[in-house]
């Protein structure tokens, strides 16, 4: 919880609602709520009806500075109203793609990813050996923060999973 200037204690959800409400007013939204939700992936869900909107924002953003949340809210709401076809602001992209973000959020992502062994060592193959060959051949750059893992259970439709933001690659065996 953080303390604002009026002496009130505000939760992160209150802070998020304040930001999304302020941006929403620019689009004539009068009833806006927003909350952080523990999704596995970095994402946002919303429901909108006439002048009401409810936003569920991945809690990976719960420690974002207000400026990042303002830019994020502005992009999302503008896209909902089809007034903005642009990508997220440079500040949002830089914050989410920073080493600090990955260091703080990757362990949370891994805990939420129930189908990962969290080990590159499989029954017959060590994925780090394969990754090392790719690096040696110059096909990828070495990334010390990359997490390579096997998936616990394989499905016929899914050969793997990748999260570019969280720097995780998982393969089914």
Stretches with model-predicted labels:
Residues 1-173:
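Active-site-proximal or metal-binding-adjacent scaffold patches in catalytic folds
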């Amino acid at each position: 919880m953080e303390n604002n200037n009026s002496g009130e204690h505000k939760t992160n959800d209150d802070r998020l609602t304040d930001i999304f409400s302020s941006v929403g007013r620019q689009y004539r939204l009068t009833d806006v709520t927003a909350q952080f939700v523990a999704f596995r992936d970095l994402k946002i869900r919303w429901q909108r009806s006439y002048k009401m909107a409810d936003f569920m924002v991945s809690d990976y953003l719960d420690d974002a500075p207000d400026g990042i949340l303002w830019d994020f809210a502005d992009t999302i709401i503008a896209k909902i109203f089809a007034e903005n076809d642009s990508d997220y602001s440079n500040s949002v992209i830089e914050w989410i793609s920073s080493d600090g973000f990955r260091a703080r959020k990757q362990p949370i992502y891994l805990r939420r990813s129930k189908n990962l062994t969290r080990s590159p060592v499989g029954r017959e193959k060590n994925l780090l050996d394969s990754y090392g060959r790719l690096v040696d051949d110059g096909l990828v750059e070495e990334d010390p923060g990359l997490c390579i893992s096997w998936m616990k259970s394989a499905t016929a439709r899914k050969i793997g999973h990748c999260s570019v933001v969280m720097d995780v690659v998982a393969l089914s065996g």
